[in-house]
Amino acid sequence: MIRYFTAGESHGPALSAIVEGMPAGITITPKEINTQLARRQQGHGRGGRMKIESDKAEILSGVRFGKTIGSPITLVINNRDWQNWTTTMAQFEKPDEQCSKITIPRPGHADLAGRIKYGFDDIRPVIERSSARETAARVAAGTVARLFLKALGIEIGSYISAIGSAAEASPDKQLEGLLLEGAEAVARQADLSPVRMLGKETETNALAAIDGASERGDTLGGIIEIFITGVPPGFGSYVQHDRRLDAALAAAIISIQAIKGVEIGTAFENARKPGSEVHDEFHLSREKGVIRKTNRAGGLEGSMSSGQTIHLRAAMKPISSLVTPLLSFDVETLQATPSRFERSDTCAVPAAGVVAEAVLAPVIANALLEKLGGDHLDEIRQRLDLYRESIRSTFHS
């Protein structure tokens, strides 16, 4: 089983991740991880932090001669901004007079509940760990799993379909063509846009919406479309709740900071229709075997992969730190006061798409290993090839 843990504070010395359970024999370089980290930093509407950081990952263990060796992989990303926070985030020295406590929670953030939960008299520790800066470590960890999947013909990609009220209808023909190449083709096309959108008109509207929100001291959320191609049918299980692939994928998406909703396929549209207009019918093809002409289920049926493209949609709320503050209160004086501003983005939806790709990779990798087993890439590839061939021979005349 692949699992990973992250550590580090937003303005601490570094972020780190330990990835355990990765099979041996996977080719990996810092360059591939750094490419994904750079993608995470892109997007119109990002804040001043992105001008400071230039995220690079260092691999400290689990790799020899450019290949994984089956032992835990340690990844470290240094925080360049740490040099400006050595007093506020000192690990051992006592705070001086300049290190004032934060006692005003921001609506929509972890501030108040985190302070209550851990008994802090200062909200700063809550801000530091709940920050979406942590997702840099998750992108690094997820990239390792992505490289494993890519070596087996499984790809993950995303694009942004809405930012604020700037939304585009599904670009069906363009999307269909890209997905035939693999999900990464969707991501490559999206990355050409500063808001990771596929339609030019919607991109223009989104850019204007972000600029308008920035001028007003406001923030914007949006909708992320994520695709996974190359997954054969039968990954996951209906037998127990904790083996359901749809549940694991949804949990991974909803674990991303500021993500408040997840949809599989066209689930919410399906809920308004009769079953005769929803379920993806089977068709038999002499050349292709069993095919579907629709994919409203999003590539998941009975909590297992169906063999179609897996499609998830994530809803990201507007970021909680606003230049124009909402109403809050001081937890020490219990006096009403405007909320405080913590340096943040106007819109981070494009970056969240990259994070979504990363967090789904370990989920698919675990479903694959649960089905096939194996400790070395060559062993697993051989088993997957046999599994795919058994499916092909069963349904082809």
From Swiss-Prot:
Reduced FMN (FMNH(2)). CDD domains: Chorismate_synthase (cd07304). This is Chorismate synthase. It comes from the Bacteria. Pfam families: Chorismate_synt. Pathway: Metabolic intermediate biosynthesis; chorismate biosynthesis; chorismate from D-erythrose 4-phosphate and phosphoenolpyruvate: step 7/7. InterPro entries: Chorismate_synth (IPR000453), Chorismate_synth_AroC_sf (IPR035904), Chorismate_synthase_CS (IPR020541). SUPFAM superfamilies: Chorismate synthase, AroC (SSF103263). Homotetramer. One of its GO terms (biological process) is amino acid biosynthetic process. It catalyses: 5-O-(1-carboxyvinyl)-3-phosphoshikimate = chorismate + phosphate. FMN binds at R129, S130, S131, Q257, A258, G302, K317, P318, I319, S320, S321, R343. Keywords: Amino-acid biosynthesis, Aromatic amino acid biosynthesis, FAD, Flavoprotein, FMN, Lyase, NADP. Its cofactor is FMNH2. HAMAP family: Chorismate_synth. Its EC number is 4.2.3.5. The keyword Flavoprotein applies. Belongs to the chorismate synthase family. NADP(+) binds at R40, R46. This reaction introduces a second double bond into the aromatic ring system. GO terms for molecular function: chorismate synthase activity; FMN binding. PANTHER family: CHORISMATE SYNTHASE. GO terms for cellular component: cytosol.
